[in-house]
A protein has these predicted regions:
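Active-site histidine-anchored catalytic micro-motif
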Residues: 2-137
């Protein structure tokens, strides 16, 4: 029986503001390689109330469609009780702050057009961190 290894890493980056997309795919793959884990899972978590993770294609037209969807679904202006950025919090509850991806033969497995993307929903530039945990053998 093989012991399960756990490798933890943090990646910190800056965002410029509302509905910005940051592709994290290469950083997750780099972390998997650093871990030495060949088979298992990579779990990525964004510990923020106004940031989400999505698996999507990074075509600019699709990213714009996602932006428009979020803006129409939860408009910036509304009868919100929370001051200043309620819409950012509400957009973040639509999608989870984490994703789990398979690791096979030392590689993160993405679909043909998939990338792991952080979506900034807050209105101000922010320093953001994601926690990347790789488990396996």
């Amino acid at each position: 029986m093989t012991d399960v290894k756990v490798f933890n890493a943090r990646y910190t980056f800056s965002t410029k503001g509302e509905i910005e997309f940051v592709d994290l795919s290469d950083k997750v793959q780099e972390t998997v390689l650093q871990s030495g884990i060949r088979n298992g899972i990579a779990h990525v978590f964004a510990p923020h109330a106004t940031g989400i993770l999505i698996l999507t294609e990074t075509d600019p037209s699709l990213l714009n469609d996602i932006r428009v969807f979020l803006e129409k679904t939860v408009p910036r202006q509304g009868a919100y009780e929370h001051p200043s950025n309620a819409h950012a919090h509400l957009r973040s509850v639509l999608l989870p702050p984490d994703k789990t991806l398979p690791v096979i033969d030392g590689q993160v497995e993405f679909g043909t057009w998939q990338s792991l993307v952080f979506v900034e929903t807050d209105v101000h530039p922010r320093k953001r961190t994601v926690i990347i945990q790789v488990l396996g053998e």
